[in-house]
Amino acid sequence: MATFKDACFHYRKITKLNRELLRIGANSVWIPVSSNKIKGWCIECCQLTELTFCHGCSLAHVCQWCIQNKRCFLDNEPHLLKLRTFESPITKEKLQCIIDLYNLLFPINPGIINRFKKIVNQRKCRNEFEQSWYNQLLFPITLNAAVFKFHSREVYVFGLYEGSSSCINLPYRIVNCIDLYDRLLLDQINFERMSSLPASLQSVYANKYFKLSRLPSMKLKQIYYSDFSKQNLINKCKIKSRIVLRNLTEFTWDSQISLHYDVINNREKILTALSTSSLKRFETHDLNLGRIKADIFELGHHCKPNFISSNHWQPASNVSQCRWCNVKYVFRNMDWKMESMYNELLSFIQACYKSNVNVGNCSSIENAYPLVKDMIWHSITKYIDQTIEKLFNVMNPVEVDGQQVISFHWQIDVALYIHIKMILKTETLPFALTLYQFGSIIKGIVNQWYDVTELDYLPLCTEQTDKLVKLEEEGKISEEYELLISDSEDDDQ
């Protein structure tokens, strides 16, 4: 087990390039970090162990030892993890780059074998080759990869992933790309590698190679917002941001293939890039469709629909002295936009409900309460129209000129009044609302705060480092909004 980790340890002194590339956290002094009880393969050292969340992408793919290096497969520094990473589509040329990288960093020849024979402190006869002493030589070249599926984008991290584990909580799946290359050609490459090994190790090498190279591919798993860590989320002014650490270098390459070309033919450039790289901290916004769905589900769960039959004049989120309407604690760590949407939705529905239904106070039990929760849950789904129609029908609509309408004459605040006029594109609000107008107002309130058609599915921490740098230069990496604060001096003028 952990052949990749052992190979990184023993091969790191072979060349100057190896000294820089093969320094992994698993072979360094252990610095304790919290464990998340997620068992899987660390994609940096390839050992099967308990994982923790990465500083660069907030996904659980790094072990408690390698986390100290703060490396991510989305960095643009050409470290070993980055060199083993390719984005889809996977071509034969990209797979050849992986094979050439393995042969460069982990060669097997008589000179290497003799070097390890001198280094290894054997306790038996020098002529014997124990597997435990020469595990680093039992490194077969396989084309297995841990695949992260970010909706339409797939990222492959190639490595020697040994053993088996349940992948239920893992953000990636292990796939075998041998059929995209050439099965017989890969067999020949490994036969040539093992030809220099002693006979006692050849059988072990061959057994390990065929076992790993013939593994069936797992079905890819779509990454969702629930897969990301919440440990690096910060809440400033009721805006959620995510702290992301990435390794940067000033050197650029046109493609990952050109980077691998320099690893083989221009090692000085790679060494310079590694020695001049730096760790940069990004504070990215966390506004994405996955988080919005999670927040809306939580909001619908904690929603107090009793507010629509109450006589409270303040916004729904500010009610604190009523046992039936108090939700103030829910918004302690929730986005300010979610709170504003909740206030406007419930204020509008309260005005409609009080205008049409003879209801006493917020302690009464009404048939509309479950529909209010459903409306919040379905506010960004395709079922919103059905829910709006059901809610409209419980408000005792009457037929006027062949159309079902409800009365609308209850008091509302000025901000909501102006917003409804903008949605309906009218100068004065009508005293009766049709189903279309009722639905348009609800959708308009939701879309004002969250236009789901323009949101990304996943957080920005899944983007490549180059894109984060570009977004930061353009001022689009953080969520910006205006605070409408009146200046007392300007007001007096």
Curated annotation (Swiss-Prot):
<keyword id="KW-1037">Host cytoskeleton</keyword>
<feature type="region of interest" description="Interaction with host IRF3">
    <location>
        <begin position="318"/>
        <end position="493"/>
    </location>
</feature>
<feature type="region of interest" description="RNA-binding">
    <location>
        <begin position="1"/>
        <end position="81"/>
    </location>
</feature>
<dbReference type="Pfam" id="PF00981">
    <property type="entry name" value="Rota_NS53"/>
</dbReference>
<keyword id="KW-0899">Viral immunoevasion</keyword>
<feature type="region of interest" description="Zinc-binding domain">
    <location>
        <begin position="42"/>
        <end position="79"/>
    </location>
</feature>
<keyword id="KW-1092">Inhibition of host IRF3 by virus</keyword>
<dbReference type="GO" id="GO:0044163">
    <property type="term" value="C:host cytoskeleton"/>
</dbReference>
<dbReference type="GO" id="GO:0030430">
    <property type="term" value="C:host cell cytoplasm"/>
</dbReference>
<dbReference type="GO" id="GO:0039557">
    <property type="term" value="P:symbiont-mediated suppression of host cytoplasmic pattern recognition receptor signaling pathway via inhibition of IRF7 activity"/>
</dbReference>
<keyword id="KW-1035">Host cytoplasm</keyword>
<keyword id="KW-0922">Interferon antiviral system evasion</keyword>
<keyword id="KW-0479">Metal-binding</keyword>
<keyword id="KW-1113">Inhibition of host RLR pathway by virus</keyword>
<protein>
    <recommendedName>
        <fullName>Non-structural protein 1</fullName>
    </recommendedName>
</protein>
<keyword id="KW-0945">Host-virus interaction</keyword>
<keyword id="KW-0694">RNA-binding</keyword>
<dbReference type="InterPro" id="IPR002148">
    <property type="entry name" value="Rotavirus_NSP1"/>
</dbReference>
<keyword id="KW-1090">Inhibition of host innate immune response by virus</keyword>
<dbReference type="GO" id="GO:0046872">
    <property type="term" value="F:metal ion binding"/>
</dbReference>
<dbReference type="GO" id="GO:0039548">
    <property type="term" value="P:symbiont-mediated suppression of host cytoplasmic pattern recognition receptor signaling pathway via inhibition of IRF3 activity"/>
</dbReference>
<keyword id="KW-1093">Inhibition of host IRF7 by virus</keyword>
<feature type="short sequence motif" description="pLxIS motif">
    <location>
        <begin position="483"/>
        <end position="486"/>
    </location>
</feature>
<comment type="similarity">
    <text>Belongs to the rotavirus NSP1 family.</text>
</comment>
<dbReference type="GO" id="GO:0003723">
    <property type="term" value="F:RNA binding"/>
</dbReference>
<comment type="subunit">
    <text>Interacts (via C-terminus) with host IRF3; this interaction leads to IRF3 degradation. Interacts with host IRF7; this interaction leads to IRF7 degradation. Interacts with host CUL1 and CUL3.</text>
</comment>
<comment type="function">
    <text>Plays a role in the inhibition of host innate immunity by inducing the degradation of key host factors required to activate interferon production such as IRF3, IRF5 or IRF7. Associates with components of cullin RING ligases (CRLs) including CUL1 or CUL3, which are essential multisubunit ubiquitination complexes, to modulate their activities.</text>
</comment>
<feature type="region of interest" description="Important for cytoskeleton localization">
    <location>
        <begin position="82"/>
        <end position="176"/>
    </location>
</feature>
